[in-house]
């Protein structure tokens, strides 16, 4: 509707999904990796300047390996709905396993996280892929990022308790009574990371109101 179009085009990092009228294929067009209203706003120009040509595809560029990891980390840890969070962890694990053996990858990854202001999403990405997927991460990388998040013991325990519930697959064997609360807390956190309160509150109120209306109501 008109509100959603305005919301996407004014505040978001992407256009509304474009659907082919015959095939039904959906195309997402992004002009940034997080919303324009997010607390951390990595420079799209920095990402484009470091993009690399895709071999065998003239004129086609992809993000550099460090930026691929940071994009995946930023997307996952700015998320508000974690029902598919495990897929994000698997994606990060695959990227780190593929690029981790390359010369200077880890040094470049840390440097890029500073340039783009994404140290804390990278911290979370490395920590939880290590715990969940047994991803191999050099000690110096984890140590370099330790200061990007609150380090008090109780905060670390709380953060782990929440993320290690929310990031596991949505299955009875991986959930407990606290899992809905963990996902609920991250739902709120994700929205506050992406939008300041003076914009978030009216947006959520409007979406809640329209979500409660009967189907077919004008």
Predicted regions: what they are:
Residues 1-218:
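Conserved NTP-donor binding/palm subdomain of two-metal-ion nucleotidyltransferases/polymerases, i.e.
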């Amino acid at each position: 509707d008109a509100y959603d179009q305005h919301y996407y085009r004014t505040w978001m990092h992407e256009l509304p999904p474009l659907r082919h009228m015959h095939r039904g294929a959906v195309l997402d067009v992004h002009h940034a990796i997080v919303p324009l209203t997010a607390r951390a706003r990595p420079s799209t120009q920095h990402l484009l300047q470091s993009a690399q040509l895709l071999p065998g595809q003239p004129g086609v560029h992809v993000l550099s390996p460090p930026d691929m990891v940071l994009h995946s980390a930023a997307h996952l840890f700015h998320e508000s709905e974690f029902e598919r969070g495990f897929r994000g962890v698997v994606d990060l694990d695959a990227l780190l396993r593929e690029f981790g053996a390359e010369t200077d990858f880890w040094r470049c990854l840390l440097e890029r996280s500073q340039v783009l202001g994404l140290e804390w999403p990278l911290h979370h990405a490395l920590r939880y892929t290590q715990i969940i997927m047994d991803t191999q991460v050099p000690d110096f990388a984890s140590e370099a990022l330790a200061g990007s998040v609150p380090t008090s013991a109780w905060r670390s325990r709380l953060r782990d308790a929440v993320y290690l519930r929310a990031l596991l697959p949505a299955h009875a064997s991986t959930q407990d009574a606290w899992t809905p609360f963990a996902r609920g807390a991250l739902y709120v956190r994700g929205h506050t990371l992406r939008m300041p309160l003076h914009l978030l509150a009216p947006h959520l109120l409007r979406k809640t109101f329209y979500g409660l209306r009967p189907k077919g109501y004008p």
